């Protein structure tokens, strides 16, 4: 009998007892609100058995409330040659919590993370998307991963995506005493319990009832609002290489020695070619541009899906021969080419996304998902995005600009901030010269320039077909059915990168006619601004990631014998969040309008959100303005 009881106890440690019936009526109403799916139960057990053995046990039950959830939250797990996925079990439950299916192994797909490139065939993922259509329903899955590497310990992130709420989530960490761990909690991570026995330390975090969040304009980045526990080792093993990770300095030394050292060797003929290409140039910056341009023309970027690809780049020789690589490989290759002409550069780990996520400087741990290159100049640092074959040297787009990243070198590493584009650099200028005929038809020329973050937004236009270019341009016009007669684009990749556009257009019946009146709308082409929620915030601060300056000038020649009846009053609204200015002038049959919208970057207190709303409303009011011109009838006619 004692043996039987002991056996049951041991089994209970490995099994996940079903403590929930997945009846959707049991989901609290606040968790269904604005949610596509609800995590009913999530358990992640991480068992670190030695410095080179770690096992995860994962169980998740997720109720899919609508069709969006089916595509957004499939079962997916990544693995590589250093990890093994085992014991996958997937069950489906109907809206009442009754089991309606067990997914056979044959329906769980297994494929390469990057198809068509044999170099990456060890990087794979397993996935399954339910074909059950009777929404809502619940998918429950269990699996385990056995891993030889202990550098990256999973973080506890109860809810990672917008539209997802959490009923209950738990993280159980077990580590042998010989493997001490570090952790740092952010943004209210629920309850924590600690315990230990003679051989192991145990930490458990649990949290419940987390409503879904949405990403709206001007919200703080997710890292400032999401519950999260970062977990990192004191010492670790990665692909057989031991290292310490209590400081950034230690990690930098390990990275250089084990991931980079010796992988920058080039074929002799390639090194000689670099020296020839740069022989007539004295400026270090110009030499960097020449080599960066060479990389852009010679190589192409191969994307490896997140979580896959390892940390070590391909060798520079492999990239030179094959002509492709991921961010690690292309950055390492560019670094090797620069080294061949005696220009030092530094491999830089960064988290690439549109929100500008910083490295947490106070908690050394593996935090990046992308690699770029830093080239120190005499007065500045030149940043190279080696995966982009169109951007000029030194330009970073919104995916990597203005955030803390980790610059690695032979003797260590340090946290640095990447290039910042302030409102004075983010400029979009629009100049419209046009004329109206007596039938209200408008013919004109638009000249637009884009700098700073706007440069990257418009750069892709250059490679589009003529038809696609016109379609995109039409989307910028707000007037009635414009006809694009001619379009040209010029991309300048000099010190201040700039896109210049010229657009010849016609708009039939642009102005309204009523007896002797001509009614002219000012809504023609921009400017725009992301809309804030039309609700004044009470407590939460808000965030403007990129400030900018947008200017638009209209010069409209009206038919002879028309005079302006209702010239608007000039406007100058200056607030902490930004500024709007409007000026109007009518002389010699020509209407001149100047409009400037400036938005300031930064984090602002909730009390100033009403000012942001005011700026937006002022912009919308400007675009609704209609000017009335009166035809002057000469006496005696």
Please identify what each model-predicted range represents.
Residues 1-21:
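Bacterial Sec-dependent N-terminal signal peptides
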Residues 18-637:
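A sensor for short, sequence-defined functional sites
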């Amino acid at each position: 009998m004692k043996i039987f009881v002991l056996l049951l106890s041991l089994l209970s440690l490995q099994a996940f007892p079903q403590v929930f019936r997945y009846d959707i009526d049991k989901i609290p109403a606040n968790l269904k609100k604005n949610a596509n799916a609800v995590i009913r139960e999530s358990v992640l057990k991480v068992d670190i058995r030695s410095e080179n053995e770690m096992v995860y046990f994962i169980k998740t039950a997720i109720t899919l409330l609508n069709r969006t959830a089916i595509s957004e939250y499939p079962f997916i797990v990544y693995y590589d040659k250093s990890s093994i996925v085992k014991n996958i079990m997937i069950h489906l439950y109907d809206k009442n919590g009754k089991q309606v299916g067990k997914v056979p192994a044959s329906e769980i797909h297994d494929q390469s993370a990057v198809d068509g490139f044999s170099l990456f065939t060890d990087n794979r993922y397993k996935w399954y998307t339910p074909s059950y259509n009777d929404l809502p329903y619940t998918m429950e899955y269990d699996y385990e991963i056995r891993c030889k590497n202990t550098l990256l310990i999973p973080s506890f992130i109860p809810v990672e995506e917008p539209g997802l709420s959490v009923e209950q989530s738990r993280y159980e960490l077990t580590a042998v005493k010989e493997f001490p761990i570090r952790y740092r909690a952010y943004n209210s991570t629920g309850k924590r319990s600690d315990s230990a026995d003679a051989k192991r330390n145990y930490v458990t975090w649990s949290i419940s009832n987390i409503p879904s969040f949405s990403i709206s304009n001007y919200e703080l980045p997710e890292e400032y609002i999401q519950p999260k526990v970062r977990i990192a080792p004191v010492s670790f093993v990665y692909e057989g290489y031991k290292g310490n990770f209590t400081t950034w300095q230690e990690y930098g030394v390990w990275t250089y020695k084990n991931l980079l050292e010796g992988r920058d060797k080039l074929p002799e003929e390639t090194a000689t070619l670099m020296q020839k290409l740069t022989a007539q140039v004295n400026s270090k910056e110009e030499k960097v541009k020449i080599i960066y341009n060479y990389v852009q023309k010679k190589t192409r970027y191969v994307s490896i899906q997140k979580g896959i690809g390892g940390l070590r780049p391909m060798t520079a020789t492999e990239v030179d021969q094959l002509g492709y690589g991921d961010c690690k490989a292309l950055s390492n290759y560019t670094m090797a080419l620069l080294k061949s002409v005696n220009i030092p550069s530094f491999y830089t780990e960064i988290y690439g996304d549109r929100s500008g996520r910083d490295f947490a400087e106070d908690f050394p741990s593996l935090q990046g998902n992308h690699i770029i290159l830093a080239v120190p100049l005499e007065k500045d640092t030149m940043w190279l995005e080696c995966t982009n074959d169109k951007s000029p040297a030194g330009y970073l787009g919104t995916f990597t600009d203005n955030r803390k990243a980790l610059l690695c070198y032979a003797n260590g590493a340090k946290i640095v901030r990447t290039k910042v584009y302030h409102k004075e650099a983010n400029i979009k200028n629009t100049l419209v010269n046009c004329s109206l005929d007596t039938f209200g038809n408008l013919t004109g020329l638009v000249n637009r320039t884009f700098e700073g973050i706007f440069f990257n937004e418009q750069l892709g236009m250059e490679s589009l077909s003529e038809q696609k270019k016109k379609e995109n341009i039409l989307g910028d016009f707000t007037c009635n059915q414009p006809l694009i007669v001619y379009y040209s684009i010029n991309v300048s990749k000099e010190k201040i990168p700039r896109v210049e556009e010229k657009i010849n257009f016609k708009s039939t019946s642009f102005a309204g006619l009523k007896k002797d009146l001509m009614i002219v709308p000012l809504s023609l082409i921009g400017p725009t601004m992301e809309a804030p929620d039309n609700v004044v915030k009470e407590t939460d601060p808000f965030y403007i990631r990129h400030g900018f300056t947008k200017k638009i000038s209209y010069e409209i020649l009206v038919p002879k014998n028309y005079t302006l009846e209702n010239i608007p009053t000039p406007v100058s609204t200056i607030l902490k969040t930004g500024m709007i200015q409007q000026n109007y002038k009518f002389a010699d049959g020509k209407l001149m309008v100047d409009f400037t919208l400036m938005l300031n970057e930064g984090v602002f207190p909730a009390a100033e959100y009403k000012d942001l709303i005011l700026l937006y409303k002022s912009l919308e009011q400007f675009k609704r303005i209609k000017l009335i011109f009166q035809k002057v009838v000469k006496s005696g006619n």
